[in-house]
Each structure stands twice: as structure tokens, then as C-alpha cells.
Amino acid sequence: MSVRHFLSFMDYSPEELIGLIRRGSELKDLRNRGVLYEPLKSRVLGMVFEKASTRTRLSFEAGMIQLGGQAIFLSPRDTQLGRGEPIGDSARVMSRMLDGVMIRTFAHATLTEFAAHSKVPVINGLSDDLHPCQLLADMQTFHEHRGSIQGKTVAWIGDGNNMCNSYIEAALKFDFQLRVACPEGYEPKAEFVALAGDRLRVVRDPREAVAGAHLVSTDVWASMGQEDEAAARIALFRPYQVNAALLDGAADDVLFMHCLPAHRGEEISEELLDDPRSVAWDQAENRLHAQKALLELLIEHAHYA
């Protein structure tokens, strides 16, 4: 059986993705009831971080421990990846010592190159193009609060970044309509727009995007690596702040999500995370449970003599 990776939602069928978020909720219930479940005993996940993170490291490391395994944190200072060793060579060596590798990186090509030479599953913990693990958590959170997202309308407000690209893939797999409100020149990548077809509508007015929407989501205006553009972006994106008044134009049962960390007073108003329509804290927690479902699926379970 060939090894499976998780680099993009497009690698999986809708049924598989729905199964993952349902399994995430089941594992969450086991955890909340104090049930010990350790199918990955003695398994080791390598976590390669070229980009810093709080939620990604915590959720994967805690997830592996809760499933009975272990996780090893590797920064660019800890590996030859940061000092010029060919990515394929690193993949060949690491996959002989580990049972899975999670990579949080800049260039998406780093992931595809690593996966092409790895004998163990490779998971996209984030790239400049996509953030599929976050979308698993988002879809699980919506399902827990509102049921199926099929046929619903989702609004993305702000930069057409990696999160926006992943929402496009989610729209195709989970069968919902996506509206993106962004300034001209900050649309999602053309390849994702083309992929979306009639599932996507790009508009300039955030009020148009949220009208009747069942889910509204946003992200920071300047992502990691864009610090030099931050001041200009803040000025340009100011009309795209998500606040209570904007949410009032959405569906009565709208949910608000933010992948965090949030810049209160910028992409969201100061109080929005505390609004009863916000499920950002559940969304953050579900990174743990959704990724445990993913680890359980991808990494070979322990065998007992």
C-alpha cells in the first residue's frame, strides 16, 4: 500500500474529509470522558518548523502524546533543511527514523518535494499556499455547532491568502458557496480561482459578501514574512474589518471564525472574539481533535506481540 500524505484537501474525497471531521468529534468526546486511547504507542512524529507557531506545535505535539506516541520539534537550526541539504535527501533520512512528518513552511514546493521522497506520511502544517489542517478544524467546528455545511454560504473577508485558498478547496469538497471580499490586487491565487469555478464569487464590498452568510471568517492582514508591508496593508484593508455591525448583515445563525492569532482593532473589532456568534475558541481547540483524527488515519498503528 502506497503512503498517503495530507498536503491539500484535493488529495482526499469529500467522503474521506467528512469522515475525518466526524472522527475528530469522536476523539474529542473520548478525551472529554477521560477514555485512554493510544493506537500510536511508540510512534514518533517529526515536526519541522520553518515558520513559528503556537497552535500548530501545541496541537500536533499534544495530539501525538494523547494518542500514545511522541513528537520531536525541529526548527531550521536543528536540521540540514535550514542549511542547504537537498530536501529530497532530508526526506529520505527522516522517513527512515520517523513514522510521520509535519512541515510548517513558506514555499509549498518544499512540501511536495519532501513528500515525493518520503516513505512515511507528510502533513502540511501550513505553507504560503494552503493551510488544510486549519480548515479541518473549521469544518469540524461548523459541523458541531450547525450540522452539515453543504449548501450554505461562507464569506471570507480580507486578504486572499493561504487560508482563503484553503476555503476555496473546502467549498469544492464540502459543497458550499464562497464569497471573498478583498481589495483589488489581493485576490486569491489565479489557480485557485480557476479551480473554484462557480463555487466562488469575489467582491469588493464586505457587506455584499456577508449578506445572508452562515459562516464569516477572516485572518490577519499581514501574514508572517509580510512585516515590511504591514503599515500599507493596515491602511488598505481598514474597510474590511469584521465587527458586530458587519455580522448583523449575515444570517441570523451566523458563526464567526478566526484562525488566530488575532490583531484586535485591525481585522476584527476589539470585542468580536467575545461576541456570542464567535466560535474562535472552539475552532482553536478543534485543531487538536481534527489533527488527531488525521494522525490516526495516516500513521501506522502500533502492533502488539
From Swiss-Prot:
Amino acids binding L-ornithine: N162, D219, S223, M224
Annotated residues for binding of carbamoyl phosphate: S53, T54, R55, T56, Q80, R104, H131, P132, C133, Q134, C259, L260, R287
Coiled-coil boundaries: none
Its EC number(s): 2.1.3.3
Pfam families: OTCace, OTCace_N
Keywords from the UniProt entry: Amino-acid biosynthesis, Arginine biosynthesis, Cytoplasm, Transferase
Keyword Transferase: yes
Enzyme class: transferase
Keyword Protein transport: no
Subcellular localization: Cytoplasm
Family, similarity comment: Belongs to the aspartate/ornithine carbamoyltransferase superfamily. OTCase family.
Alphabetical list of PANTHER family matching this protein: ORNITHINE CARBAMOYLTRANSFERASE, MITOCHONDRIAL, ORNITHINE TRANSCARBAMYLASE, MITOCHONDRIAL
Record's protein name: Ornithine carbamoyltransferase, anabolic
Species of origin: Pseudomonas aeruginosa (strain ATCC 15692 / DSM 22644 / CIP 104116 / JCM 14847 / LMG 12228 / 1C / PRS 101 / PAO1)
